[in-house]
Amino acid sequence: MFTGSYVALITPMYQSGEIDYPSLKKLVDFHIANGSHGLIAVGTTGESATLPFDEHIEVVKRMVEFADKKIPVIAGSGANSTAEAIFLSEQMAGTGIDGFLSVVPYYNKPQQKGMVAHFNAVADATDLPVLLYNVPGRTVADMLPDTVAELATHPKIVGLKDATGDIARLKQMQPLVDKDFVFLSGDDATGCEFLTAGGHGVISVTANVVPKQMSQMCEAALAGNYSKAKEIDQQIAELHSALFIEPNPVLPKWALYKMGLIQSAFLRLPLIESELDSQNHIEQVMRNSGVLS
């Protein structure tokens, strides 16, 4: 259902902190023109933690409007309160989105059975497909393979974004689920390896900056041309690491500002704009990768 390169899109903001919707449209157009296979609205990279519900929902609505059915839009709907996750999902269900991305509840460290109850409740509350999102580096709680397998039996839970970077875990999960269950990498550094091990796509931060290369890499891997996929991945490998020198999405925003795609690299507190050394480093990497001339 959801395969290829899905970009974990940033949420552009003016220096005042308000959402910059003209730049958001420019970004959506940029991804359509450069072959991205889908957009993730207001996930981790979209600063979901600092967008109140009304803004969160409005950004999703605008992205759907700008995408104009030319590219799928999946909305981040995760929360560490099951009631809030359900509320968000219900509010966004009628916006025209193609599905939800729902993260493992963070901070309160639910048990595995608690995760099962949480995600089943979220999926029961919608008619749209749900992607699970496991990112223990941010949430602390880790959704284990047997838990994924149990949740995969729910008819609305169609896949998993796995940001562990652990290819062995992917291989462990594959025989536990139906063949139609989708595995998407949430770790750019290991995304190509994930695809060659049988993954179906990526939800990528790097794709903010090089959408064409990421979509071409995915297309090559999914067609079985692993040598071409690895060749493309090597061309952008420096970007994979450079974009994460500071917490995401600090440097992706600065890179897009440098590319002229957004008007400001502003982030909402507690995130702040990148250090000069980081900016100089990623600018050089962008030149090395052909992003900047």
UniProtKB/Swiss-Prot annotation:
SMART domains xref list: DHDPS (SM01130)
GO cellular component: cytosol
GO molecular function, one term: 4-hydroxy-tetrahydrodipicolinate synthase activity
PANTHER family in UniProt: 4-HYDROXY-2-OXOGLUTARATE ALDOLASE, MITOCHONDRIAL (PTHR12128:SF66), DIHYDRODIPICOLINATE SYNTHASE (PTHR12128)
Pfam families: DHDPS (PF00701)
Keywords: Amino-acid biosynthesis, Cytoplasm, Diaminopimelate biosynthesis, Lyase, Lysine biosynthesis, Schiff base
CDD domains in the record: DHDPS
Reactions that this protein is recorded to catalyse: L-aspartate 4-semialdehyde + pyruvate = (2S,4S)-4-hydroxy-2,3,4,5-tetrahydrodipicolinate + H2O + H(+)
Protein's name in the database: 4-hydroxy-tetrahydrodipicolinate synthase
Key word Transcription regulation present: no
Function comment: Catalyzes the condensation of (S)-aspartate-beta-semialdehyde [(S)-ASA] and pyruvate to 4-hydroxy-tetrahydrodipicolinate (HTPA).
Top EC category: lyase
Active site: 133, 161
